[in-house]
Amino acid sequence: MDDSMDLDLDCVIAQPSSTIVMMPLSPISTRKRRRHPMNKRRYAKRRFTPVEPNDIIMCDKPTHCIRLVFDQSLRWVHFDGIKNILTDYDVIFNPDLHVTVALVCAGNGVTFSDLTPLTFILADMLLEFNGIFTLGQTLVIGAREYHWLPQELKTNVGKAIPQAKEWLVDHGYNVYHTGLPTHMSLAKLHSLDFVQQSYVGSKFFIKHSHTTEYAMPVCLQVIAIDGEKVDGRSKPLFQYPIHNHYRHYRACFPGR
């Protein structure tokens, strides 16, 4: 083969009938296109465990309430003025004061296990009640965990109620998430019309916005939401005493 027949390895020659076009030889990549990690998670095929009939619980609304109650001899000093105002509207102050830890959907045949571990999580928890407002047709006061113990005495200060909910979920309970803030119901306003409810709510907000109470729960109860009541108080299905070991620790205790 003579020199005129040599091919230039750096190009590919296409020879149509009229012109000659020279194109650079570019290697073809065999690498796969990289995807963003978020796209990988979004579009990757996922394998799910088949759902069994026993895994499905038909529950339109919560059936049980896990709640914290207080010593019945506790004197709520700042609530006297609230009771007097409610009397003018023929509204009864709630005799069953409590704070809800979680609402649970329990179908037929669902049983509650021993909830004693929750009492250790919730022990020595001081609640601060402040800020009265209306929530739907209910007059409530906001509640939050008060940081009163040093970290070396109580490691979950301010986290007890969320940890209690996590414990229930981890142990198979179907917790109903309301999205409502932690609070304590003071009175039902169902007997009032919308204008009266709004007026009462604003009146309490203005006059009692600085009302603050402190209390420490003494018992954990499980009640049926539509269950029996005795003297206006829900009859508990189960109850577990809470042993507050540092209730006499007064270094940072603002209340009783």
From Swiss-Prot:
<comment type="function">
    <text>Plays a role in the inhibition of host innate immunity by inhibiting the interaction between host IKBKE and MAVS. In turn, this inhibition prevents the production of host interferon beta. Additionally, may also interfere with host antiviral response within the nucleus.</text>
</comment>
<keyword id="KW-0899">Viral immunoevasion</keyword>
<dbReference type="GO" id="GO:0044196">
    <property type="term" value="C:host cell nucleolus"/>
</dbReference>
<dbReference type="GO" id="GO:0042025">
    <property type="term" value="C:host cell nucleus"/>
</dbReference>
<protein>
    <recommendedName>
        <fullName>Non-structural protein ORF4b</fullName>
    </recommendedName>
</protein>
<keyword id="KW-1113">Inhibition of host RLR pathway by virus</keyword>
<keyword id="KW-1035">Host cytoplasm</keyword>
<dbReference type="InterPro" id="IPR044318">
    <property type="entry name" value="ORF4b_HKU5-CoV"/>
</dbReference>
<keyword id="KW-0945">Host-virus interaction</keyword>
<dbReference type="GO" id="GO:0030430">
    <property type="term" value="C:host cell cytoplasm"/>
</dbReference>
<dbReference type="GO" id="GO:0039724">
    <property type="term" value="P:symbiont-mediated suppression of host cytoplasmic pattern recognition receptor signaling pathway via inhibition of IKBKE activity"/>
</dbReference>
<keyword id="KW-1090">Inhibition of host innate immune response by virus</keyword>
<dbReference type="GO" id="GO:0039502">
    <property type="term" value="P:symbiont-mediated suppression of host type I interferon-mediated signaling pathway"/>
</dbReference>
<keyword id="KW-1048">Host nucleus</keyword>
<keyword id="KW-1224">Inhibition of host IKBKE by virus</keyword>
